[in-house]
């Protein structure tokens, strides 16, 4: 049994243990394997270990992998990097999800270029929940307007929000960010029937993300590099 297989088993067990310990419903938590800078062989090992959704940060690297792994028809590809206007066509034509819509122009362009496909692209709105100058994502005060724009795009399926909160020194402040994100998610659920996805949590904050009801976590290092304990 390889390390990737072992890591995935441990991560899944940790998730289910946390949910049970906190009396949360034993719901299905989607694990997105962040596969940037990972070789095809490692991705194949993850696939053989039961992972079927992968996140890519760089367009061309992602496209190369999609082409090389075409025979795996059940694989779902997420674009999780910053979306540049001149890359929207290739993203819309090749990826199943885009998790990082943070401005109206990007939503409009993705919708335009997705038209050739027979099914809409699943999308998330990226929110800069910590209001960091260096982070991508729309600021909290403007999210409602962007949500409305996305919801009106016929070739986009508006599924929810994605966040990457800043790592805070004080846990109370960290949890405030997660709490605010969960609040926005629930507000959007009231407004739009299609909303069902809160993409929150990485290798280093899985438990915190689950505590605030994330149902999609993005894990790279703990799958492909470290031996999880």
From Swiss-Prot:
Record has Phosphoprotein as a keyword: no
InterPro entries assigned to the protein according to its UniProt record, in alphabetical order: Ala_racemase_N, PLP-binding_barrel, PyrdxlP_homeostasis
Alphabetized UniProt keyword annotations: Pyridoxal phosphate
Keyword Protein transport set for record: no
GO molecular function, one term: pyridoxal phosphate binding
Modified-residue entries (N6-(pyridoxal phosphate)lysine), positions: 36
Domain of life: Bacteria
PANTHER family: PROLINE SYNTHETASE CO-TRANSCRIBED BACTERIAL HOMOLOG PROTEIN (PTHR10146), PYRIDOXAL PHOSPHATE HOMEOSTASIS PROTEIN (PTHR10146:SF14)
Family to which this protein belongs: Belongs to the pyridoxal phosphate-binding protein YggS/PROSC family.
Oligomer and partners: Monomer.
Name listed for the protein in its UniProt record: Pyridoxal phosphate homeostasis protein
Source organism of the structure: Buchnera aphidicola subsp. Schizaphis graminum (strain Sg)
């Amino acid at each position: 049994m390889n390390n990737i297989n072992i890591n995935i088993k441990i991560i899944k067990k940790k998730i289910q243990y946390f949910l049970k310990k906190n009396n949360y419903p034993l719901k299905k938590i989607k694990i997105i394997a962040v596969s940037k800078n990972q070789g095809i062989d490692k991705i194949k090992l993850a696939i053989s270990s039961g992972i079927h959704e992968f996140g890519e940060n760089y367009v061309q690297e992602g496209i190369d992998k999609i082409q090389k792994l075409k025979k795996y028809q059940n694989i779902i590809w997420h674009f999780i990097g910053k979306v540049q206007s001149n890359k929207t066509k290739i993203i819309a034509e090749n990826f199943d999800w885009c998790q990082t819509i943070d401005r109206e122009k990007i939503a409009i362009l993705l919708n335009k270029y997705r038209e050739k496909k027979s099914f809409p692209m699943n999308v998330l709105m990226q929110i800069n929940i910590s209001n960091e100058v260096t982070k991508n994502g729309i600021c909290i005060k403007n999210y409602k307007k962007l949500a409305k724009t996305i919801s009106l795009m016929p070739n986009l399926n508006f599924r929810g929000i994605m966040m990457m909160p800043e790592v805070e020194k004080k846990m109370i402040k960290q949890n405030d960010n997660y709490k605010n994100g969960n609040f926005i998610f629930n507000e959007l659920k009231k407004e739009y029937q299609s909303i069902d996805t809160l993409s929150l949590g990485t290798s280093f904050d899985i438990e915190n993300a689950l505590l605030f009801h994330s149902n999609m976590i993005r894990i790279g290092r703990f799958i492909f590099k470290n031996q999880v304990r």
